[in-house]
């Protein structure tokens, strides 16, 4: 237990170090800084960042331990999964629903974070031993069905993501819409429903691209995949950011956390059933 805690602590430090390095590099490039709705108390922000980093490290450690392949394979799979969500998809979402800005800076910073934490995770936590390469696992994965079957199933997964998003997001929208309509806490509503559909379709493609390498390298049961992937998705797609958004009231963050948890678990189980 003590050894595990020590490893998680080191992974958290690597995440923080990657964030700091990415932030300094982004600043040196002169990228636009985010404009938070109120001045940040850096001490409080640091506490929340450290706590959220621990959660990310714990989630990724469990994910990495279920992956087959060598360390380089697991590093690439984990780093891409983290960056696809924390560097790309979350930035797209923030651009649509917030006025904070700084999405390019965040994308660059998250690249450093993703590489740093993924490196620490695969060095400190062993994966499942596998005598095959990722390329052979990839061929085996897609050999299970015909091209027509894969086309249909992948299309359903891409379409399912926006549907899941709206199923759980619409009830939450009824609860928190006033905050978005009044531009409270740096929030805003998208310009139109059509724009929102387009954005979620783009995010759906990145979500699938982030999940496929994990499915290929996965060496546990499908049931375990549904839970492990779903919880990891919850962490990287929302919990990490919501834990640090301390300027928002707890009620708002809690409602969105429940929404994202249901989104993520449902999407994880859809992947399990369809792919």
Predicted ranges, named:
Residues 1-275:
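Juxtamembrane/disordered regions of integral membrane proteins
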């Amino acid at each position: 237990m003590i050894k595990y805690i020590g490893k998680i602590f080191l992974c958290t430090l690597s995440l923080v170090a990657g964030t700091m390095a990415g932030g300094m590099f982004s600043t040196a490039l002169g990228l636009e800084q985010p404009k938070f709705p109120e001045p940040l108390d850096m001490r409080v922000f640091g506490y929340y960042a450290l706590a959220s980093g621990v959660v990310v490290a714990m989630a990724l450690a469990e994910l990495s331990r279920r992956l087959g392949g060598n360390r380089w394979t697991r590093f690439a799979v984990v780093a891409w999964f983290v960056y696809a969500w924390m560097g790309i998809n979350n930035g797209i979402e923030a651009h649509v629903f917030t006025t904070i800005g700084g999405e390019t800076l965040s994308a660059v910073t998250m690249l450093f974070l993703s590489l740093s934490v993924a490196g620490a995770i695969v060095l400190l936590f062993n994966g499942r031993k596998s005598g095959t390469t990722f390329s052979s696992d990839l061929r085996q994965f897609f050999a299970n069905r015909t091209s027509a079957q894969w086309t249909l199933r992948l299309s359903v997964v891409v379409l399912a993501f926006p549907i899941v998003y709206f199923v759980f997001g619409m009830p939450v929208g009824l609860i928190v819409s006033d905050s978005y309509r009044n531009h409270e806490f740096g929030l805003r509503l998208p310009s139109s429903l059509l724009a929102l559909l387009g954005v979620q379709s783009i995010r759906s493609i990145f979500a699938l691209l982030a999940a496929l390498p994990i499915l290929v390298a996965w060496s546990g049961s499908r049931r375990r995949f549904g839970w492990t992937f779903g919880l990891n998705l919850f962490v990287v797609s929302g919990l990490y950011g919501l834990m640090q958004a301390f300027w928002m009231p707890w009620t708002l963050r809690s409602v969105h956390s429940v929404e994202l948890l249901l989104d993520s678990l449902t999407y994880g189980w859809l992947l399990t059933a369809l792919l």
